[in-house]
Amino acid sequence: MSTTDVVLLLSSVPERTSDLVYWLDEARLRYRHGPAFPTLGSLIAHLVDSAPKVDGLLRHAHLDGQTTADVRAAIDPSHDQDLTRPLQEALEDFSRVRRRTVDLLHGWGKAEWDRTISDPRGGEMTLLDVCRLVAKHEMGHVAQIRNLSALLPEPQDLGRVGQAGANGK
């Protein structure tokens, strides 16, 4: 995957995520398909929470010359939390942070992409490898969101609610 491919994939994740979930209401965001499945809200929270961590990791490596970082912790924060703010606000923040990251990446030359960073759990990797890992991870979650949202149960029409008269009749 080239640098152009990586930047394109990273820039497309917020928009693709928004396209898939803009229509979800609170009940659908919290719906759990089964005990082993995350809710759509927790998947979205996971993507939204990782964006500033990935952005910070890349900025510190680029601007501060940081050579050690926990890449996995930035890419894959906890899945346990649900979405704690309105969906639209979370998606807008995700897009804003990702635009900032992509703007940074557009300015990188070969030396920057080839700069290595040491991850205590993953060993040495280039910043291009880090971005490839982020892109693959996020695209996997986009596919997961697509699949889970396609499998949501259809809302049921329980019929017209009648007016209750005196004594509940």
Where are the regions a protein language model picked out?
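Short Lys/Arg-rich basic patches
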Residues: 2-6
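Short, contiguous alpha-helical
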Residues: 7-11, 15, 28-74, 116-169
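Conserved catalytic core of Hanks-type protein kinase domains
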Residues: 23, 46-47, 107
